[in-house]
Design a protein with these regions (language model features):
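Hydrophobic h-region of N-terminal signal peptides that target proteins for export
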Residues: 9-18
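Structural recognition of the beta-strand scaffold that forms the well-ordered cores
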Residues: 30-35, 65-72, 109-114, 144-149, ...
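Aromatic-lined carbohydrate-binding/catalytic grooves of carbohydrate-active enzymes
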Residues: 38-41, 52, 56-155
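Aromatic-lined carbohydrate-recognition surfaces of secreted/lumenal glycan-active proteins
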Residues: 108-124, 171-188
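Glycan-recognition surfaces
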Residues: 133, 178-281
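Catalytic cores of secreted or luminal carbohydrate-active enzymes
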Residues: 264-313
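Carbohydrate-binding surface patches
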Residues: 269-272, 277-279, 315-354
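C-terminal beta-strand-rich structural cap/linker in extracellular carbohydrate-active enzymes
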Residues: 371-392
Length: 392
């Protein structure tokens, strides 16, 4: 069967002109919650997912812009005699459609997970050879967002072809579904996925760690806030409305990051125009976690309709400066101290190509703080950020 599948995949280009993705979706980076970072495989069930939807509303996250509740791996257990995917009846006794209906009743959207290989990363049934059948099932269930992973693929399986096949299947099924590609940047999806999906992973998996050692050749290594962020450098040209680089889900609120590190993590993802997919337990958030995830000033930077991904303009002795052009001529600036020592800031804006005449708003302090006519001075503690909005 898999030989036939590969033959079918290899011929996808002849059909590409007759298929497309849902172009109107994800005009700004998707915002939501995914189960994996906190609950992994064993922790998910119908009760947990319903409670996450309730908490997204009650916590103010929905009002802040979060929309998607996404079940990651381990919701599926097999296929019936007709090949239809079967959900785990123990974990999800009410069924997936009823769960989707509940989430929709909250004014939220529902997402689910699959894999392009023979099995998912956790060894559950995947979609290889069942793309059109699964897409029809997702549409019937009321799915609004699909994450497709890249585990257990066949030798020689072609990533662009495989993901294009699922794109076509989703489009034919007729329900607008945001398509999230998750092949960890292994096949440089930024170079081919703009017309395939709405977002693509550009890094390996993240964890709740501030930094990871570089690879032997000096290149960044994923698995941390800074490692995943560094891997975004140079990819800004590929992001825009409807097609986003994805440095992986947020670890804000998960054990392992300090409050300062969580604030920096969130700030950097907003500067990168990254999808804001929370990965913590929404039912038990600290005040600090809630304040970070719902900060209206930072979310406005991420969701800016111009859709430009921010980029690094300076990196010197552990101090990094990022800029992000915004609609209407404003500019967001992020100052990051990635090092372990406090830094004293004292610079002229022209050092970073920014002219005079701009008013400055400190987005975390939520207050105006001068203009670019004078030197910027301040203190930046270890692993801290200052995020500023410059306006004409």
């Amino acid at each position: 069967m898999f030989r036939a599948v590969l033959v079918g995949i290899s011929g996808f280009l002849t059909l590409a002109s007759n298929a497309q993705k849902f172009e109107s979706l994800a005009q700004t980076p998707p915002m939501g919650w995914n189960s994996w970072n906190k609950f992994a495989c064993d922790g998910i069930n119908e009760k947990v997912i319903r409670e996450m939807a309730d908490a997204m509303v009650a916590s103010g996250m929905q009002q802040a812009g979060y929309r998607y509740i996404v079940i990651d791996d381990c919701w599926q257990v097999g296929r019936d005699s007709a090949g239809n995917i079967i959900a785990d009846a123990v974990k999800f006794p009410g069924g997936i459609r009823a769960l989707a209906d509940y989430i929709h009743s909250k004014g939220l959207k529902f997402g689910i997970y699959t894999c392009a290989g023979t099995k998912t990363c956790a060894g559950r049934p995947a979609s290889l050879g069942y793309e059109y059948q699964d897409a029809r099932q997702y549409a019937a269930w009321g799915v609004d967002y699909l994450k497709e992973d890249w585990c257990n693929t066949l030798k020689g399986q072609n990533a662009p072809a495989s993901y294009t096949l699922m794109r076509d299947a989703l489009y034919k099924a007729g329900r607008p579904i945001v398509f999230s590609l998750c092949e960890w940047g292994s096949n440089k999806p930024w170079s081919w996925a703009e017309d395939v999906g709405h977002l693509w992973r550009s890094t390996g998996d993240i964890s709740a760690v501030w930094n990871t050692p570089a690879n032997p050749d000096g290149s960044p290594r994923s698995g941390s806030v800074l490692g995943n962020m560094d891997l975004e450098n140079g990819l800004e040209q590929y992001a825009g409305p409807g097609h986003w680089n994805d440095p992986d889900m947020l670890e804000v609120g998960n054990e392992g990051l300090s409050v300062d590190e969580s604030r920096a993590h969130f700030s950097l993802w907003c500067m990168l125009a990254a999808p804001l997919i929370a990965g913590n337990d929404l039912r038990n958030m600290s005040d600090d976690t809630r304040a970070i995830l719902t900060n209206k000033n930072l979310i406005a930077i991420d969701q800016d309709p111009l859709g430009r991904q921010g980029y690094r303009v300076s990196m010197k002795e552990g101090l990094e400066v990022f800029v992000k052009p915004l609609q209407g001529g404003d500019t967001a600036v992020c100052l990051l101290n990635r090092g372990d020592q406090e830094k004293q800031l004292d610079f002229a804006w022209k050092e970073y190509g920014i002219g005079s005449g701009h008013s400055i708003k400190d987005l975390w302090k939520d207050r105006q703080t001068g203009t670019t006519d004078t030197r910027f001075r301040g203190t930046l503690g270890r692993h801290q950020v200052i995020v500023l909005r410059l306006s004409n």
